[in-house]
């Protein structure tokens, strides 16, 4: 009998890297047919994996190790000046948990966000089915967190996975016209606060990539731990 903790893995064909120019990327995927649950997934996340929809993967590139799994140890986190400012500026926002299901209001915000922040990124022409397949897994405890202002206007949505040792920031999208609010920063700060309230030690942020503007911002959250050489350690940027 196959052990509950055993997985089969598959390597993807090489493809152009989405984050670094002139680089080729390959991913290691957990068997999509294997039964997955919060305990198994949490174990894989601690080993540097992440999910997109129901597919659980981690980068496994032959000549590059730029993608570093990253997490915030919430008990040690101390916001910097700009993060404190973003938190204070957004105190008029309310957060509400919603189940993962299609809402036209969410999808419209998702499309506007991608069209402005990531045009020609491969997702800005997503259909409702594409959107749900990207956000939902079908096997994990995922919530959509709505952030609304005092006029009940939807400004941001964060998809968050529950793990046995933390929260995993799956994806977030927000009003591209609300630049002064620094909503991307605020959402991560909210997730840190929520993990603390739930007595969970970590917020997992996916991958930190030093030379990618899309991914390097994560090192602004101190301390940041990265998974290297089969262990988590505090990132020391050089």
From Swiss-Prot:
Top-level taxonomic group: Bacteria
A GO CC annotation given for this chain: cytoplasm
Biological processes, Gene Ontology terms: ubiquitin-dependent protein catabolic process via the N-end rule pathway
MF terms in GO: arginyl-tRNA--protein transferase activity; leucyl-tRNA--protein transferase activity
This protein's record includes keyword Transport: no
Record's protein name: Aspartate/glutamate leucyltransferase
Keywords assigned by UniProt, alphabetized: Acyltransferase, Cytoplasm, Transferase
Assigned protein family: Belongs to the R-transferase family. Bpt subfamily.
InterPro entries recorded: Acyl_CoA_acyltransferase, Asp_Glu_LeuTrfase, N-end_Aminoacyl_Trfase, N-end_Aminoacyl_Trfase_C, N-end_Aminoacyl_Trfase_N
Gene: bpt
Function: Functions in the N-end rule pathway of protein degradation where it conjugates Leu from its aminoacyl-tRNA to the N-termini of proteins containing an N-terminal aspartate or glutamate.
NCBIfam families: PRK01305.1-1, PRK01305.1-3, PRK01305.2-3
Assigned EC number: 2.3.2.29
Enzyme class: transferase
Cited SUPFAM superfamilies: Acyl-CoA N-acyltransferases (Nat)
Reaction catalyzed: N-terminal L-glutamyl-[protein] + L-leucyl-tRNA(Leu) = N-terminal L-leucyl-L-glutamyl-[protein] + tRNA(Leu) + H(+); N-terminal L-aspartyl-[protein] + L-leucyl-tRNA(Leu) = N-terminal L-leucyl-L-aspartyl-[protein] + tRNA(Leu) + H(+)
Localization in the cell: Cytoplasm
């Amino acid at each position: 009998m196959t052990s509950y903790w055993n997985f089969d893995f598959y390597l993807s064909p090489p493809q152009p890297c989405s984050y670094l120019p002139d680089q080729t990327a390959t991913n290691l995927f957990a068997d999509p047919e294997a039964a997955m649950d919060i305990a198994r997934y949490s174990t894989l996340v601690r080993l540097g994996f992440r999910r997109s929809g129901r597919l659980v993967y981690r980068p496994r590139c032959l000549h590059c190790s730029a993608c570093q799994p990253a997490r915030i140890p919430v008990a040690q986190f101390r916001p910097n000046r700009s993060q404190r400012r973003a938190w204070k500026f957004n105190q008029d926002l309310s957060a509400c948990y919603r189940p993962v299901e299609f809402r036209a209001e969410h999808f419209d915000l998702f499309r506007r966000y991608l069209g402005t922040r990531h045009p020609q990124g491969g997702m800005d022409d997503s259909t409702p089915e594409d959107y749900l397949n990207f956000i939902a897994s079908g096997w994990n405890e995922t919530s959509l967190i709505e952030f609304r202002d005092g006029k009940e206007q939807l400004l941001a949505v964060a998809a968050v996975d529950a793990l046995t040792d933390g929260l995993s920031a799956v994806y977030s999208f927000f009003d591209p016209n609300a630049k002064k609010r620094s909503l991307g920063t605020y959402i991560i700060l909210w997730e840190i606060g929520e993990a603390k309230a739930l007595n969970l030690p970590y917020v997992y942020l996916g991958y930190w990539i030093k030379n990618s503007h899309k991914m390097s911002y994560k090192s602004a959250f101190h301390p940041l731990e990265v998974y290297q050489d089969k262990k988590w350690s505090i990132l020391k940027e050089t």
